[in-house]
Curated annotation (Swiss-Prot):
The lineage of its organism: Bacteria, Pseudomonadati, Pseudomonadota, Betaproteobacteria, Nitrosomonadales. The keyword Glycosyltransferase applies. Changing residue 572 to A: 2200-fold decrease in Vmax for UDP-glucose, 2300-fold decrease for ADP-glucose. Belongs to the glycosyltransferase 1 family. Gene3D superfamilies: 1.20.120.1230, 3.10.450.330, Glycogen Phosphorylase B. GO terms for molecular function: sucrose synthase activity. NCBIfam families: sucr_synth (TIGR02470). Catalyzes the reversible conversion of sucrose and a nucleotide disphosphate (NDP) into fructose and NDP-glucose; although the reaction is freely reversible in vitro, the physiological reaction seems to be sucrose cleavage. Unlike characterized plant enzymes prefers ADP as a cosubstrate, whereas plants prefer UDP. The KM for sucrose is 8-fold lower in the presence of ADP than UDP. Its preference for ADP over UDP suggests it may directly link sucrose and glycogen metabolism. Optimum temperature is 75 degrees Celsius. Retains about 55% activity after 15 minutes at 65 degrees Celsius. Keywords: Glycosyltransferase, Transferase. This is Sucrose synthase. Optimum pH is 5.0. SUPFAM superfamilies: UDP-Glycosyltransferase/glycogen phosphorylase (SSF53756). PANTHER family: PTHR45839, SUCROSE SYNTHASE 1 (PTHR45839:SF7).
């Protein structure tokens, strides 16, 4: 039975309840009702009319309702990533199926108060009809597994053609002018089989530890170049993998073999916005977890790239460039330096390229991430020239970060013909309620018209997209995912998206990051602890000296500590945590609250949203007289100090709280858990997957302050009765991180993904040429005019 049939049957059987429910919605004096509003209306109706299981099941599938007499337009999500649209007349109660376009057009009319003129409809759907796609929602985010199975099955169903494609792919690889794998680039499968047999026979007679340099003369005579292995054992292992594929190909064997090919030695990573540096930047505007993520990421990737190249006998030092914006007015940061080596790496560098105006003038000051769109096209051209010079050639992979970095990655990938990977970190669209339909009201402040257009361009251009969690793509049974919100939406008078992204596209892959294991390790490891930092930490938390950028003094220092650390912005919701703490006498009696974030003086911030949150913090502390129970540190901590602070809080049997209204992933959560600190984190976003509730931490609803305060208070009271409760959650957190969230696992997966997508792009024509033409037109006719208009407004 379809959803519309369900509603029709429900109306026949429970006409009074359906009519009463619709009447309640229409009299709510709101045209747009959210999921929570629709469910609240149902609960009230059930009190009057009794409960209908069928009606309840229907309403609990609703995501949104638009009510303008006499019609109710409804958006339903019967399954993850699958949507239906319908309307029902408030008097006749006969449901009718709608197209996406009809639903969005009605929504626009209701919001604007008048019929909308014809606008551009954006539809990427037709371009992907012939492309392999997943069918089950549970498989979303496992794209490379599906793609490898699907395409290897098709490829090797034509054995000769498949073998030829594979050999052609192996024959084109070279690094710094050095030919790899095959020296003669033979496509004759029979000749290659003979070469492999002869090589393996020879290798059997040698000591397995014989290095490649001694093998090279004989291997060269047989047609083999470096890349098979660093010694005889590894060469034989790699050659046997290829022989197995030629004999009886399978997706797993192909993936294992491709992971051995030394095809990634130069990596370009893009992160334009904010203050990207290694010191004195965290907490500055638009500068937070993404910087930490990338710096930890490149350390792991460089090591993985180096180890793989060495294992395959390729004596080349890999190079990684992180490209960001050069800011001449950089304060006490290094963001005005063109080139900076990344500490802990051998050949990884931060390359800074300035934003320039059309006349070539360099822009000296920081620019909000919401206002950088006019500068990215010129920036991309400058980056292309400087990055190629630094790398000594084309990169093997381009990784974009956030909306701006992904757009620049799109421009560069198109020009250079290089595999493109996108990492969104956080898509703004799900952070701001109705930010698409009311985009015009937000335009002066956030310029979402540019950002959402850039997002559509980048996500449809990418060869593969990496996310930290499943929810980031497709949400949960209850709520839509970040990428899912781009499937269909409307920006009145601009364009209407009826198919923006396909969540079942195999480009989506979940690869979760970790915490730096050298910095964030268990509190119970005394030999690695930085004991010399303890006096400084105690001074930060307990000292009432006036020379610190702090407010509040903890009158009772023996209480356990509730700790939080984040930027001061509305979404991070630190003021929400302070408010729920202030409103709970029980929680205030059990624990003190320690906050690290933002500035104490709003005049020291240049970010308007941060300034608002600073004022709100002071207001809450004044109103609730919190100065003896809350310690607020308006400062940035270096990594070692932050790591030891987590462990010090754990020593005191405290907890970490992450109260964000939404969190795409949550690196601070991983850091806290890796330190053994019990963690309470928002249920909205990635933390719902990271934390196993009541096993490795706790989920909280930041919109339910009283319930959150009670949950935390219950935990502290249980610990007083049974200290083993704290130990149980602490150990659960450590186990969870070790099994799922480490940078070593991340780097291994990223390198495998890049090789597989590079291979399939080469052998099967995954260029999506038609889509690229459409995207090119969309960029020039839609994004560029929006960016130019913004340039004249700011």
């Amino acid at each position: 039975m379809t959803t519309i049939d369900t509603l029709a049957t429900c109306t026949q059987q429970n006409r009074d309840a359906v009519y009463t429910l619709l009447r309640r919605y229409f009299t709510a004096n709101r045209t747009l009702l959210l999921q929570s509003d629709l469910r609240e209306g149902l609960l009230q109706t059930e009190q009057d009319c009794g409960q209908s299981d069928m009606l309840r099941a229907f309403v609990f599938r609703l995501q949104e309702g638009i009510f303008s007499s006499p019609w109710a337009y409804l958006a339903l999500r019967p399954e993850i990533a699958k949507w239906e649209f319908m309307r029902i007349h408030q008097e006749h109660l006969i449901p009718e199926k709608l197209t996406i376009s009809e639903f969005l057009k009605f929504k626009e009319t209701v919001v604007k108060g008048e019929a909308t003129e014809s606008v551009l409809e954006v539809d990427f759907g037709p371009f992907n009809r012939g492309f392999p796609r997943l069918k089950e929602s549970r498989s979303i985010g496992q794209g490379v597994i599906f793609l490898n199975r699907k395409l290897s099955s098709e490829m090797f169903s034509r054995i000769e053609a498949g073998h030829t494609s594979l050999l052609h792919f192996l024959g084109v690889h070279a690094i710094e002018g050095q030919q790899l794998m095959f020296s003669n680039n033979s496509h004759d499968i029979h000749a290659v089989r003979n070469q492999l047999r002869q090589a393996l026979e020879m290798l059997e007679t040698l000591d397995g530890t014989t290095p490649w340099i001694e093998l090279a003369p004989k291997m060269n005579q047989l047609g083999f170049a470096p890349g098979w292995g660093h010694n005889a054992n590894r060469v034989a292992e790699t050659m046997n993998m290829l022989m197995d594929i030629l004999e009886a190909p399978s997706p797993s064997a192909l993936e294992e073999f491709l992971a051995c090919i030394p095809m990634i030695s130069r990596l370009l990573i893009l992160s334009p916005h904010g203050y990207f540096g290694q010191d004195n930047v965290l907490g500055l505007p638009d500068t937070g977890g993404q910087v930490v993520y990338i710096l930890d990421q490149v350390r792991a990737l460089e090591k993985e790239m180096h180890d793989r190249l060495q294992l395959q006998g390729v004596q080349v030092e890999p190079k990684i460039l992180i490209v960001t914006r050069l800011i001449p007015d950089a304060g006490d940061t290094t963001c005005n330096q063109r080139l900076e080596k990344v500490s802990g790496c051998t050949n990884t560098w931060i390359l800074r390229v300035p934003f320039r105006k059309h006349n070539g003038e360099i822009i000296p000051h920081w620019i909000s991430r919401f206002e950088i769109w006019p500068h990215l096209e010129i920036f991309a051209g400058d980056v292309e020239r400087e990055a190629l010079a630094e790398l000594g050639g084309h990169p093997d992979l381009i990784i974009g970060n956030y909306s701006d970095g992904n757009l620049v990655a799109t421009l560069l990938s198109r020009r250079l013909g290089v595999t493109q990977c996108n990492i969104a970190h956080a898509l703004e669209k799900t952070k701001y309620l109705h930010s698409d339909i009311y985009w015009q009201e937000n335009e002066d402040k956030y310029h979402f018209s540019c950002q959402y257009t850039a997002d559509l361009l980048a996500m449809n251009s990418a060869d593969f997209i990496v996310t930290s969690t499943y929810q980031e793509i497709a949400g949960t049974r209850e709520a839509e995912g970040q990428y899912e919100s781009y499937q269909a939406f409307s920006m009145p008078d601009l364009y209407r998206v009826i198919h923006g992204i396909d969540l079942f596209d195999p480009k989506f892959n979940i690869v979760s990051p970790g915490a730096n294991a050298d910095i964030y390790f268990p509190y119970s490891d005394p030999n690695r602890r930085l004991h010399s930092l303890i006096p400084e930490i105690e001074s930060l938390i307990f000292d009432d000296a006036t020379n610190l950028p702090a407010r509040g003094y903890l009158q009772d220092p023996d209480k356990p500590l509730i700790f939080t650390m984040a930027r001061l912005d509305r979404i991070k919701n630190i003021t929400g945590l302070v408010e729920l703490y202030a409103a709970s006498p029980r929680l205030r009696s059990l624990a003190n609250l320690v906050i690290v974030g933002g500035k104490i003086d709003p005049q020291h911030s240049s970010d308007h949203e941060e300034q608002e949150q600073i004022h709100r913090m002071h207001q809450l502390m004044d109103e609730h007289e919190l100065d003896q129970q809350v310690r607020w540190l308006g400062m940035r901590l270096d990594k070692n100090l932050a790591g030891e602070l987590y462990r010090y809080i754990a020593d005191k049997r405290g907890i970490f709280v992450q109260p964000a209204l939404f969190e795409a992933f949550g690196l601070t959560i991983i850091e806290a858990m890796a330190s053994g600190l019990p963690t309470f984190a928002t249920r909205y976003g990635g933390p719902l997957e990271i934390i196993q509730n009541n096993r490795s931490g706790f989920h909280i609803d930041p919109n339910q302050g009283a319930a959150t305060a009670d949950l935390i208070a219950d935990f502290f009271e249980k610990n007083l009765e049974n200290p083993q409760e704290w130990e149980r959650i602490s150990q659960g957190a450590l186990d969870r991180v070790a099994s799922r969230y480490t940078w070593k696992l991340y780097a291994e997966r990223m390198m495998t993904l890049s090789r597989i997508y590079g291979f399939w792009k080469f052998v099967s024509g995954l260029e999506r040429e038609e889509t690229d033409r459409y995207l090119n037109m969309f960029y020039h006719l839609q994004f560029r005019p929006l960016a130019n208009r913004l340039a004249h407004e700011i």
